Swiss-Prot record:
This is Tetraacyldisaccharide 4'-kinase. Transfers the gamma-phosphate of ATP to the 4'-position of a tetraacyldisaccharide 1-phosphate intermediate (termed DS-1-P) to form tetraacyldisaccharide 1,4'-bis-phosphate (lipid IVA). One of its GO terms (cellular component) is plasma membrane. One of its GO terms (molecular function) is tetraacyldisaccharide 4'-kinase activity. HAMAP family: LpxK (MF_00409), UPF0434 (MF_01187). Pathway: Glycolipid biosynthesis; lipid IV(A) biosynthesis; lipid IV(A) from (3R)-3-hydroxytetradecanoyl-[acyl-carrier-protein] and UDP-N-acetyl-alpha-D-glucosamine: step 6/6. In the N-terminal section; belongs to the LpxK family. It comes from Nitrosomonas eutropha (strain DSM 101675 / C91 / Nm57). Residues 337-396 are annotated as: UPF0434. Keywords: ATP-binding, Kinase, Lipid A biosynthesis, Lipid biosynthesis, Lipid metabolism, Nucleotide-binding, Transferase. It holds the Pfam family LpxK. Its EC number is 2.7.1.130. InterPro entries: LpxK (IPR003758), Trm112-like (IPR005651). Residues 1-336 are annotated as: Tetraacyldisaccharide 4'-kinase.
Length: 396
């Protein structure tokens, strides 16, 4: 258990001192929401739909896998999503694209993990001002037609078309029930009434103050498996690694949880523990006798440049209720009914403009002579699904 989890579990004199600060924070957020709702404070509308995915608690291990599943769902439906997020202090001013080569101190673990898992399929951009980040991403990736904000629950300046709030009951059950800075909650449960859907992780339990009008879906852990960091297409089960000489290396603050997981998987390992702020170098892995080196997912971002094929990553798989896909696509269909939105979409191949043909329900790329279909209200921006225009067909 790391220090923050221990802090959130207790109520001490320090928590009692911070409790009035928590109440002031909630009051401040309520006033801000009221001012934005009354248009006294001005929010910014982006040209493409925005989906905010964030957690009501300070941390949630399911947020990154949930975002990845939403991205894959959108791409399978023919959409071209991009991800925006808040930057670290070191990149306070400028929006930046995140790749697996981005410095950890600039990009942060979560953004690097997203860039690693979604490389070449979904751009990831971060920066201090989410509005400017979104504009920079859309300017660079003109083919993107929907944005996912991987935080921003409390950034009311950013208009959102759909909001997914994660409620991790495993965090709440072990917490003291207080709002930051006195506890793990980032806002009161009443905030959930302003979201579109709630995704619940952990134990299935009634969430207070949510109301009956907010749909709740569940994200459920499935099996754990390992993938090779240098060759992620290679995967292995615990049984396949059981007879290997294994060293487990981590600088994750939740060290014991990682080792307990390996023990639960019946793997015998030799542990090596580094400090939380440690940056791995090749010299940290001198053990020639090790056939396999296991690391937790959070530490994978610190090993991208090592190119050691012995390094395998422990990954937890999750399943999300199918109803979440249905309700998100329903909302996006409503947005794409606006011809103004269809008129600004770009070809995913040449990045050039598309011509909206309402009578044919197609988006025409004049340069590549391709017609992308609009099916069930969703523009399907997939080359394999596009109709190749014959030479004799005139494009107007």
């Amino acid at each position: 258990m790391n220090w923050s989890e221990l802090y959130w579990q207790r109520i001490t004199p320090l928590h009692l001192l911070l409790w009035p600060v928590s109440l002031l924070f909630v009051l401040f957020q309520s006033i801000r929401r009221h001012l934005y709702r009354r248009a006294i404070l001005t929010s910014v509308h982006l040209p493409v739909p925005v989906i905010v995915v964030d957690s009501i608690t300070a941390t949630s291990p399911v947020k990154t896998p949930l975002i990845i599943q939403i991205v894959n769902m959108l791409r399978a439906s023919g959409l071209r999503p991009g991800i925006i997020g808040h930057g670290y202090t070191d990149n306070y001013h400028s929006p930046m694209s995140v790749t697996i080569d981005s410095p950890l101190q600039l990009a942060g673990k979560k953004s690097l993990l997203l860039a690693y898992y979604l490389r070449e399929t979904c751009p990831v951009w971060i920066g201090h001002d989410r509005i400017e980040v979104a504009k920079a991403l859309l300017e660079t990736h003109k083919e993107c037609n929907v944005l996912i904000c991987n935080d921003g629950l409390q950034d009311l300046r950013l208009q959102r078309d759909f909001e997914v709030v994660i409620v991790d009951t495993s965090v709440i059950n072990s917490g003291n029930g207080l709002i930051m800075p006195a506890g793990p909650l980032r806002d009161s449960f009443a905030r959930l009434k302003h979201s579109n859907v709630v995704v619940q992780a952990g134990h299935h339990r009634q969430i207070p103050d949510i109301g009956e009008e907010i749909r709740t879906f569940y994200i459920t852990p499935l099996k754990e498996h390992f993938f090779n960091l240098s060759r992620p297409e290679l995967t292995a089960s615990a049984a396949e690694l059981a007879n290997k000489r294994i060293h487990a290396v981590t600088c994750d603050p939740d060290i014991q949880n990682f080792l307990d997981n390996l023990k639960f998987l019946r793997l015998t390992v030799t542990p090596y523990i580094f400090s939380e702020d440690h940056h791995f170098v090749a010299e940290d892995f001198p053990f020639d006798e090790a056939e396999i080196i296991l690391i937790p997912e959070e530490d994978a971002v610190k090993c991208f440049n090592l190119h050691d094929e012995r390094i395998w990553v422990l990954q937890q798989e999750y399943r999300v209720d199918l109803g979440l896909r249905t309700i998100i696509l329903k909302k996006l269909r409503e947005k794409f009914m606006d011809p103004k939105l269809l008129d600004i979409l770009a070809c995913p191949l040449c990045k050039g403009p598309l011509i909206y043909k309402k009578d044919r329900l197609e988006l025409i790329c004049k340069a590549d002579r391709l017609a992308y279909p609009i099916r069930d209200g969703i523009p399907v921006m997939l080359e394999d699904e596009a109709r190749r225009l014959p030479d004799e067909e005139e494009i107007k």
